[in-house]
């Protein structure tokens, strides 16, 4: 048996295999048919010539036009560090010149690009001559789920395979890249767990400071992760909103740049790559239904932004999935507001749930989430903690995936919506598992 480095043939085979797997379009890897061996060899040989090492950026021009308030439309200068709108304190969105971007980024050119979120470089804000802060984020699998589906087509987008084992890596890669580029040296974030770990990792990679404020009852794995990655960790008696308030109180004197959810404009740009990847993996035919675990809602908001951009690029049509926000029964501000027909969500009192990513009593992007749910003819559903544990175990024992409680909540939601007739037979539904169950071991003790 040959080992790597023993003879030329296995070395070439390994190199071609790695190149082929990294650069083959995502929908081929996840959904499409296998290529014939001869075709695969020719494709691998061609793609090897075009291969881009993971740490090397594409020489793509930047098409960022402006920053614009998502509520009042006021423009802001993208050449400076920005937080919320200076007029109305609402989140800022990045606006791109999509007509110009479409000249260098097409569905065909994506075939030659590395399997990471930076494959969509033209619709990301970092200048072309600046290297991203990257740990290989993006390119996560889309897997068919058969156990719970019956005559439904159910898939899971497994974000636990990102660096730091959660979808938060997407947002932090882009946001830390931009913060460093614009001169920030000290970054701060309130976190229920996964955002803190992601900031700690990407700040370490970028050579900047990370200051993370977490509720004292955050799962221990998340706290240890942040500390071992070199971050300054402060534990607070309270919720994530209390952590955010402490950052707001101290950031001026400490020189911190606030990286809170939607309080800077670039985490959502990283999260929107969920939408681009999903469309690519589905061969540019969006699913009928998306079930998304919703705390701060950046992923849901980002995907909707991606769908609008892809339509402008001519990559997809006008069809949109019905978006369902899945929350915990013990912290369901979006569920309560949607059911009441409100445009904003009031702070949820006495918030509690084992799903730390869903324990967000007040989301700054609530008005955006509620607008998307209405536009998509989607809806909301709240899931009890006991159901999260039950479905996490069911998914693990039947599908081989150790999902986080937030992801498990989506499986419970799917079953409920299917039973209520809100997902029809034959429709394609996609569940997002936003993190690894390994980070929530405290939840499964003595259960």
Per-range role (PLM):
Residues 5-7, 32:
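Residue-identity detector for glycine
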Residues 59-447:
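PLP-dependent amino-acid enzyme catalytic core
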Residues 34, 55-58:
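Short, positively charged and aromatic/hydrophobic N-terminal segments
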Residues 2-3, 27:
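Intrinsic-disorder-associated, low-complexity terminal segments enriched in Asp/Asn/His/Tyr and depleted
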Residues 9, 46-50:
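Cationic, low-complexity basic patches in intrinsically disordered or flexible, solvent-exposed regions
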């Amino acid at each position: 048996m040959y080992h790597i480095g023993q003879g030329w043939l296995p070395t070439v085979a390994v190199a071609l295999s790695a190149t082929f797997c990294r650069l083959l379009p995502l929908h081929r890897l996840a959904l499409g048919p296998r290529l014939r061996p001869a075709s695969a060899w020719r494709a691998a040989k061609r793609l090897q010539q075009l291969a881009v090492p993971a740490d090397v950026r594409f020489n793509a021009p930047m098409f960022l036009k402006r920053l614009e308030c998502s509520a009042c439309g006021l423009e802001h200068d993208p050449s400076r560090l920005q937080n919320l709108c200076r007029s109305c304190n609402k989140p800022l969105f990045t606006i791109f010149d999509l007509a110009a971007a479409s000249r260098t980024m097409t569905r065909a050119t994506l075939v030659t690009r590395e399997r990471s979120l930076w494959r969509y470089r033209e619709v990301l804000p970092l200048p072309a001559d600046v290297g991203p802060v990257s740990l290989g984020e993006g390119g996560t699998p889309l897997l068919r789920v058969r156990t719970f589906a019956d005559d439904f087509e159910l898939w899971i987008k497994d974000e636990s395979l990102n660096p730091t084992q959660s979808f938060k890596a997407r947002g932090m890669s882009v946001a830390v890249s931009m913060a460093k580029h614009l001169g920030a040296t000290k970054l701060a974030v309130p976190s229920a767990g996964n955002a803190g770990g992601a900031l700690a990792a990407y700040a370490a990679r970028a050579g900047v400071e990370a200051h993370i404020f977490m509720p004292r009852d955050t799962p221990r794995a998340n706290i240890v992760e942040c500390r071992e990655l070199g971050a300054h960790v402060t534990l607070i008696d309270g919720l994530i909103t209390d952590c955010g308030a402490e950052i707001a109180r101290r950031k001026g004197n400490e020189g911190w740049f606030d990286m809170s959810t939607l309080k800077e404009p670039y985490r959502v740009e990283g999260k929107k790559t969920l939408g681009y990847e999903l469309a690519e993996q589905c061969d540019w035919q969006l699913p009928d239904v998306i079930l998304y675990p919703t705390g701060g809602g950046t992923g849901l908001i980002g995907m909707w932004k991606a769908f609008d951009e892809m339509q402008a690029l001519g990559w997809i049509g006008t069809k949109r999935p019905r978006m369902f926000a899945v929350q915990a029964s013990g912290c369901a501000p979006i569920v309560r507001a949607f059911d009441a027909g409100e445009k904003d969500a009031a702070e949820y009192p006495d918030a509690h749930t084992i799903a730390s990513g869903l324990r967000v009593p007040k989301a700054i992007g609530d008005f955006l989430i509620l607008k998307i749910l209405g536009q998509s003819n989607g809806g909301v559903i709240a899931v009890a903690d006991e159901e999260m544990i039950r479905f996490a175990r069911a998914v693990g024992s039947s599908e081989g995936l150790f999902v986080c409680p937030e992801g498990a909540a989506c499986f419970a939601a799917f079953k409920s919506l299917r039973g209520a007739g809100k997902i029809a037979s034959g429709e394609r539904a996609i569940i997002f598992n936003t993190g690894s169950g390994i980070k929530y071991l405290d939840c499964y003790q003595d259960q």
